[in-house]
Amino acid sequence: MPKMKSKSSAAKRFKKTANGFKHRQSFTSHILTKKSTKRKRHLRPKKQVNPSDVPLIKRMLCQ
């Protein structure tokens, strides 16, 4: 049986950590002028994937 291919879009967006998966916060790529400095600062750090979404991410990444 051939090797499973991971979804390349998911591989670019999610990274495996010891506690699960991390991802970049949304709403940070464009139209930043109307967003406050505080809002942009809080959107900056990486976030943990919700535990209910972890099985889907694992399946997309073939883990």
Swiss-Prot record:
Species annotation: Hahella chejuensis (strain KCTC 2396)
UniProt keyword annotations, A-Z: Ribonucleoprotein, Ribosomal protein
Positions of the UniProt region annotated as Disordered: 1-55
Highest taxon in the source lineage: Bacteria
PANTHER family associated with the record: 54S RIBOSOMAL PROTEIN BL35M, LARGE RIBOSOMAL SUBUNIT PROTEIN BL35M
Family according to the record: Belongs to the bacterial ribosomal protein bL35 family.
Stated name of the protein: Large ribosomal subunit protein bL35
Feature: compositional bias, Basic residues: 1-25, 32-47
HAMAP family with a match to the protein in the record: Ribosomal_bL35
MF terms (GO), sorted A to Z: structural constituent of ribosome
GO BP terms, alphabetized: translation
Ribonucleoprotein in keyword set: yes
Any one GO cellular component localisation term in the record: cytosolic large ribosomal subunit
